[in-house]
Amino acid sequence: MWMAKRLIGFCMLCIVCQPLLAQRKVRLADLPPFERVVVCVKYFEGLHGREHYPYVGYGHRLLPGENFTINMTERQADALLRADLMKRFEYFKGYGKDALLLTLLSYNVGVGRLLGYGKHPKSRLLQKIEAGDRNFYKEYVSFCRYEGKILQGLVRRRQVEFALFYLP
């Protein structure tokens, strides 16, 4: 059942991203893995405008002392996204083939939600990966709540991300 969902999610992403990549005549599958992560984030986040403040670019949350403007160009937003993803990748590069999947998830939910902080323990997802358990689809897709409610858009996003970046 979950394999069918993965396949459907992957097909949805390929169909939706086709127009984005058609401008350069590049297939999603032909891109290097990090570039696929960038395309995936750009698709799901979109370029944020004034109504999404304090988020700018492709979902970057402004931190104290940062002075990025809401009126970023697409090129500036792309550079900021790549810098953010590389910073997050540094946290997870020790996780081998799951590093990109964890990087992508942490861009949306935060590094602290995965690694744990303060009184919050490490996520069950990381615990399973560290234990060598490769059956963590349920734990990955469980990061689909906003203010306690399950959002179907986030469920679909997690399914597509898992289909694209999970390596058995």
Regions found by a protein language model. Give the residues of each.
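Early exported N-terminus immediately downstream of N-terminal targeting peptides
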Residues: 53-56, 60
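Short N-proximal segments of mature Sec-exported proteins
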Residues: 99-113
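Long, amphipathic alpha-helical surface segments
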Residues: 11, 23-48, 60-65, 72-91, ...
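Surface-exposed patches in mature extracellular/periplasmic domains of secreted proteins
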Residues: 49-53, 91-101, 139
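Bacterial N-terminal signal peptides that target proteins for export
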Residues: 1-8
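Bacterial N-terminal signal peptides
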Residues: 9-17
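Sec/Tat signal peptide C-region and signal peptidase I cleavage site
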Residues: 18-22
